[in-house]
Amino acid sequence: MDNILDAHYFLLPSQGNIYTLSKITQTNGVNKVLFSSLKRKLFLLEYHDHLDGCLKPVIKEILFTYIPNGAEIISLDVFNKSTVCDDFFIGITIIKPNPDHNNETYLNIYSEQDLDVNPELNIESIAQNCLSIDLNFVPYQLYHTQILRQFDDAEPRRETNSFIYYNIDYQFYSRRITAFGCECGHMQISVVDTVQSTILSSHVTQFEGSVSRVQLFNLCNYVNLPALDLISDKHRKQETKDEMAINVVVTSTLQLSAVFMDIVNQGLNVRCNLEGSDKYDSVLCSCLADVDMDGEVEIIIGTYAQELLMYKYEADKWELKSRRSLELPIQSLLYVDVTGDGMRELIVLTLGGLHVMQHNQDLVYDKLQNRLKQLFKNEELPTVEKEKDLIEKTEDERTDESETDDANVSEYNHPIFVTGN
């Protein structure tokens, strides 16, 4: 991970946990990061253009209502319920100690920004509009997903204890893949036909200790390529069957973390252990990142022993390629373009603060130059007029694709919050 450099660091007044880091993605493509400490403090990280032409990080505390004194934040999550404007929901779960009775737990849902008055994202306004729901259990992860059809409730029975982490993915709006891990080490995946509301397959395995995270992914780092004639078909990368397959990475607090390959077709039969992941205390988090910018994702895991470990898939196995030491235990990871420069940053939440790590800009420039040379080798460079025609053609094609996608999604395709307990 030598090509990932520390750019900024922000101290927290108190520690967070594995659930207190989330991204906010606006409809214009701008990303922001919302994170919190346990002691009622929530912060927003964003980047602003400065007069000197440089991007400046800005951290501001957001004062959310209905978080009483003495309460602690357990988890948070954010999603946009609209595809054409910034109409966000922010969910925060809290626990309030009560010496006379059982601890009180709540799910606070913040929304109702007046888009007619102020169509731009205003976190401060959203933070003042709260629906507080009294819970009769202690929540863990807060997660949002989509309901594609009104009565789609087919899932295998889960007679286990507390969920630690939950992840859902969809294939072509007709198949739902669900993975979850529990405090007891139980880990389960299921594949559901959402059209017929039937369970196609379900698989279970057991880990020693708690499962700290499950994450579904493809090997290929997908990018929507523009349909420009200046890029010939021979340069367009065609995804292989292995790259299209859905895999799941499972991190464990006591034993080797593992990746199960092609779970839709193979279930949990193809297991690749992440060798060395059990040597650095408990693994608390993971994320998927194209660290070397080769178009394929690598797995980064964070440990309580303050280590970042990066694994790459080569020769049908996941190999430890590099590691990096930080000063405090690592609790959560995000890989998101928060600076708006087209390159994603690695966001690392530790016990003491938030790291923003960036790709080495010199290496990025060299990589871009080499790829442009490969693309335009022995090919005619486009004229300005041709570029304009191609841009208009691409925009028309995107409009047609958007209309097609909207037609394939039913009227019940709205995100909802899901809490793990």
Describe each region flagged by the PLM.
Residues 1-421:
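Beta-propeller-forming repeat regions
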